């Protein structure tokens, strides 16, 4: 690889590393309705409930894979759909949010901060909140 190519890759990597905290801090700030610097489960579920309503374009009270637009992979969708009807109702969707929230809260303090949101578990939760 040329020196120019390496320079471009290094610059890109630095940019991505530098922006990771910004998006997670921004999301926490958006969801943190009590302004304590963290997101608790109630705040996460409130945001997820609003997103559910926004994604439910046909207003049938469920989300199918098309409406979820890649926010949930096939394996997680199947697990979150215990009645196997091919859709998630709001309770099933919020149960998935709670499961991902708990996975993103390794210290079990009931809140997620920007650092926890940047973890793999936090990154899987984020698309269900915004």
Predicted ranges, named:
Residues 30, 53-54, 79, 102-103, ...:
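Short beta-strand elements of solenoid repeat domains
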Residues 1-10:
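Bacterial N-terminal signal peptides that target proteins for export
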